């Protein structure tokens, strides 16, 4: 992650597909002296309780796990008891939990990383 941050233009935001990846990304950004969210916003998929206690608290996309479990059990019950096989796809909307790791994008969104070789300073 740190090497990637040095080699690419600094993005305005990073979306981590897993919470663990968000933790690695946050630590790499902090080690490189890149301020979250002032320079880069960070968002993660999944919303464990600990996300609210990071520095800064992490913006996340929460899956409706309880509702997903209820629907799965209902579909399994219907299949076993009623002989009704589920058809199609059912989508349950996620919820955006906005915390302090996100901000509006900075004006110079394409500015090179301040730590990249030959890059401009912030």
Language-model features: where?
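Short, intrinsically disordered C-terminal tails of secreted or membrane-associated proteins
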Residues: 120-121
């Amino acid at each position: 992650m740190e090497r990637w941050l040095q080699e690419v233009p600094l993005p305005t935001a990073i979306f981590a597909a897993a919470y663990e990846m968000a933790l690695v990304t946050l630590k790499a950004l902090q080690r490189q002296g890149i301020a979250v969210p002032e320079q880069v916003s960070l968002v993660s998929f999944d919303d464990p309780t600990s996300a609210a206690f990071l520095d800064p608290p992490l913006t996340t996309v929460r899956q409706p796990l309880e509702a997903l479990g209820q629907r799965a059990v209902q579909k399994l019950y219907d299949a076993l008891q009623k002989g009704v096989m589920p058809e199609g796809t059912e989508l349950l909307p996620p919820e955006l939990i906005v915390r302090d790791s996100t901000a509006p994008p900075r004006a110079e969104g394409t500015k090179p990383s301040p730590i990249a070789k030959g890059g401009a300073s912030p």
